[in-house]
């Protein structure tokens, strides 16, 4: 069966694993998911990302990150633009998440970037998700 929203599936897998404090998760790989995972790593939300080659499309292995007392680093994930209702933002309307404490993932003509990077480059695009 085909998946109608692979980004929402990825975010749900991360959210569920984070709630029960799993060390790592594996999910089917795609270029968009790789870009999102790399942004989450660079912003400090996850420890590491590995791409595991298999006979098909490959597997992304994400290593989740927790604080000193096993508190969650990712406190929330929310899918914004969905297949049934796309959400776009102009360069000057890119949203801030929790006044800059979180990030918005924006799909632009220059690839997937954070809200801060989109404002810096003065580009808009599709608001994929919020992470805080």
Swiss-Prot record:
Self-association and partners: Part of the 30S ribosomal subunit. Contacts proteins S5 and S12.
Role: One of the primary rRNA binding proteins, it binds directly to 16S rRNA central domain where it helps coordinate assembly of the platform of the 30S subunit.
Any one GO MF annotation of this record: structural constituent of ribosome
Segments crossing the lipid bilayer: none
GO BP term, pick one: translation
Keywords on record: Ribonucleoprotein, Ribosomal protein, RNA-binding, rRNA-binding
PROSITE patterns tied to this protein: RIBOSOMAL_S8
Organism: Staphylococcus carnosus (strain TM300)
GO cellular component: ribonucleoprotein complex; ribosome
InterPro entries hit by this protein: Ribosomal_uS8, Ribosomal_uS8_CS, Ribosomal_uS8_sf
Gene3D superfamilies in the cross-refs: 3.30.1370.30, 3.30.1490.10
NCBIfam families reported in the protein's UniProt record: PRK00136.1
Pfam families assigned: Ribosomal_S8
Family named by the database record: Belongs to the universal ribosomal protein uS8 family.
Top-level taxonomy: Bacteria, Bacillati, Bacillota, Bacilli, Bacillales
Keyword RNA-binding attributed: yes
Record's signal peptide: none
Protein name, as recorded: Small ribosomal subunit protein uS8
């Amino acid at each position: 069966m085909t998946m109608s929203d692979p980004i929402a599936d990825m975010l749900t897998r991360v959210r569920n694993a984070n709630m029960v404090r799993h060390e790592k998760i594996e999910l089917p790989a795609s270029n968009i998911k790789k870009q999102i995972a790399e942004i989450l790593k660079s912003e400090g939300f996850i420890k590491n990302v590995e791409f595991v080659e298999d006979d098909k499309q490959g597997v992304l292995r994400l290593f989740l990150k927790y604080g000193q007392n096993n508190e969650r680093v990712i406190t929330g994930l929310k899918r914004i633009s969905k297949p049934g209702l796309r959400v776009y933002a102009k360069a000057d309307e890119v949203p801030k998440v929790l006044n800059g404490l979180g990030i918005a993932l924006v799909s632009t003509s220059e690839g997937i970037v954070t809200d801060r990077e989109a404002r810096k480059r003065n580009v808009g695009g599709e608001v994929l998700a919020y992470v805080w």
